[in-house]
Amino acid sequence: MEEHNKNINRRDFLKIVGISAATTTAAATLYSCKQKDGVIPGGSTSTPVPTDKMTYRTSVAQKDRVSLLGYGCMRWPTVPSPDGKGDMIDQDAVNELVDYAIAHGVNYFDTSPVYVQGWSEKSTGIALKRHPREKLFIATKLSNFSNYSRENSIAMYRKSFEDLQTDYIDYYLLHSIGNGGIEAFKARYIDNGMMEFLLKEREAGRIRNLGFSFHGTVDRLYPFPAG
């Protein structure tokens, strides 16, 4: 990568990823809603959840009609592994949750290579594969927190496609920018050439929207010079 691409300011960063692509997802608690006879554990009751009341927002760039409520796939239900060594994702429960969410208007699903001990993307892919791809919006992330190398980062990116069983990703996010400051950001995305790589992937259509996710305060969100 050319040297000038390694010097990024706030304006350049927002121009690259597009501030509108920074998507915040609500972790849906739909499993508790789908209980027999509308009874939620703890003794309270619920009325039937309507299937035609979802609110949608249309993106400016792509004209995607995305549900206001997104499904965060960070904590899928688990069951004990048959070998007794830890837990595994309960795929039947995940399928049921996804079906219920889609039936009630949710069409945005957010995951990551590191969620649920690394199994979220595969489980999410299995569940979503049972539904028409063109009606869904899948978001995942470049979660290269420990190994910043270009080789590892590209391998993580490509495995997301394999596990999610898709040939394009609607929203690809730089995961949790701001943590570690500008030096960590540059190491994860700039110095290793990943930003350049991801921009080319977007041009090729394998990434429809390139954005970022973030946890923290404004001063950590904008650690870049304001040029």
Q: In which residue ranges do the predicted regions lie?
A:
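Conserved, mostly hydrophobic/aromatic
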Residues: S59, Y71, F109, T124, ...
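Acidic (Asp/Glu)-rich catalytic clusters
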Residues: A61-K63, G125-R133, F161-Q165, P225-G227
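Acidic/histidine-rich helix-loop elements
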Residues: C73-I89
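C-terminal segment of N-terminal export signals and the immediately downstream linker at the start
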Residues: T29-G70, D83
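Glycine-rich, proline-tolerant flexible connector loops at the mouths of alpha/beta enzymes
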Residues: T111-A127, I182
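N-terminal secretory signal peptides
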Residues: M1-D12
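Glycine/proline-rich, positively charged
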Residues: P80, S149-G227
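Alpha-helix-loop-beta-strand connector modules within alpha/beta enzyme cores
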Residues: G125-I138, M194-K200
